[in-house]
Amino acid sequence: MTDNKNLGGSTLLPAYFGEFGGQFVAESLLPALDQLEKAFVDATNHPEFRQELAAYLRDYLGRPTPLTECSNLPLPGQGRGYARIFLKREDLVHGGAHKTNQVIGQALLAKRMGKTRIIAETGAGQHGTATALACSLLGLECVVYMGAKDVARQQPNVYRMQLHGAKVIPVESGSGTLKDAVNEALRDWTATFHESHYLLGTAAGPHPFPTIVREFHKVISEEAKAQMLERTGKMPDVVVACVGGGSNAIGMFADFIDEEGVELVGAEPAGEGLDSGKHGATITNGQIGILHGTRSFLMRSSDGQVEESYSISAGLDYPGVGPQHAHLHSTGRATYVGITDAEALIAFQYLARYEGIIAALESSHALAYALKRAKLAEEEGKQITILVSLSGRGDKDVDHIRRTLEEKPELILKEEER
């Protein structure tokens, strides 16, 4: 694999975020990437495409999504006005998560390009579900690659994809998780790109995917900024989102990046602990390298081999991260922190018990960080407003969480915490 930049090629849009990004792919895929970039630039400059996309976001996805303030959480110092936590409710998007935002955009783009077949990868099944429903809506063939382990732990989403007419292909190779599903999807696309579009589900991969995914997800932060100004009269102090590959986070960060007074925080999966060897905290504990066509942080061994990631949340179980997140980290514009499985499970239970919201395990990582910051605000005697990307709903996780809590009863909320 070589980088298009080093082949003397050129791109219409910047292919790098600082030192991160690029097109580290087989030369046979470069024409497909060039075609995709040109189609994206043409489409987003075309009023009819923008109007069609806006109509689907409004009438099919249900945008704008609401902003909900947590009013019942037993926050430290809440009665003294230290912390206010607001949730951007991407769990209410049709399909159950933020994923559908950019899936509709890419599917419309693929149809505009004359593609008849959509290839996708999925971890938790949310991206696969979003892709399947978009293909059903737009009359496109849909093939979804999913790690065999993820198929086993996300059966409801597998069935949902099949109900929408998608062919779900379990991937047994490697660790049988998201990384391996991406590998198989890329192999498929390499062989079939003349009729197929690879609908990448995260803000990673070779250029122009990180830019395309960000631009189609930017609606999250555009809405949230306007809603926060309307509700509070000011910007949030902290914006937090979970980070696996980084799609919901880059959508949530995008419109706040130039707001210097807003702190951006990505909550990575620390799994069983950053020193346990079982985590997916790519930026917090990773190294710079190349994975799935892009230069970014990844989990790899001293001899350069990609290591297996781990998270209780299938959607965060990925050993890489989008290149713009790597750049935001390296420049200090955003901070990335590890949240353990246990912390996410506690946050999940708090939100369900006190606010009546079943959040995805992915989103629960972001909420767990918000709860930590609320406690810190009380200790410091400072007021703080925290905006959380509630990236998806947790229906898919309920059985998994029930089994986990049965195995680890010490993580069940105590009566006094209820």
UniProtKB/Swiss-Prot annotation:
Task: Tell me where the transmembrane regions lie.
Answer: none
Write one Pfam family the protein is assigned to.
Answer: PALP
Database matches in HAMAP family: Trp_synth_beta
- Entry GO CC: cytoplasm
Residues with N6-(pyridoxal phosphate)lysine modification: 99
Where in this chain does the entry annotate a coiled-coil region? none
Classification via NCBIfam families: trpB
InterPro entries according to UniProt: Trp_synth_b_CS (IPR006653), Trp_synth_beta (IPR006654), Trp_synth_beta/beta-like (IPR023026), TrpB-like_PALP (IPR001926), TrpB-like_PALP_sf (IPR036052)
* Cofactor (UniProt): pyridoxal 5'-phosphate
- Report the protein name in the record: Tryptophan synthase beta chain 1
The record ties this protein, via PANTHER family, to: TRYPTOPHAN SYNTHASE, TRYPTOPHAN SYNTHASE-RELATED
